[in-house]
């Protein structure tokens, strides 16, 4: 992980169009409820309190004409460590946590030791390293040179471990049983 990547996220933040979900120009809409917004912004507060470097702060976003909306802007943390709650917990909001490692083996180990297995991203110029990482990590989705592993909302979830969704949960036998009535 290098500092240029973290710096480039600032450009993404400045160009990200946040607005109502009904606006076709919006790239990111509001969070679901006031409680959801409070939870996500509380997670951001906790990350700051635990010592993560807050590079982009999305808290307190107010959009003109939508002052009562549940908007939180994109948030970027750098220098996150595995003992921090923003690393341990799944944050269902626009929060990206960067964990720096020395090599690809350390990255795979870090991902595999995590209790959740929803998705991870790797940034590299080495195609072989990206393929090896994707093969070796025990997660449902891998993004290569993208900040999130699934950039399309209609893509089915494929999380593993405690992430619930995946081929052993709603996208597998449990989902078939849920939508099937035996006669």
What residue spans do the PLM features occupy?
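Short linear capping/connector segments at secondary-structure termini
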Residues: 23-29
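Single conserved hydrophobic/aromatic residue that forms the stacking wall/gate
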Residues: 1-12
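Conserved dinucleotide-binding and phosphotransfer motif residues
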Residues: 50
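Conserved C-terminal structural/oligomerization subdomain of aldehyde/semialdehyde dehydrogenase
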Residues: 17-18, 28, 44, 67-183
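Short beta-strand to alpha-helix junction loop
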Residues: 31-41
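Hydrophobic packing residues within well-ordered alpha-helices of enzyme cores
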Residues: 8-9, 40, 130-133
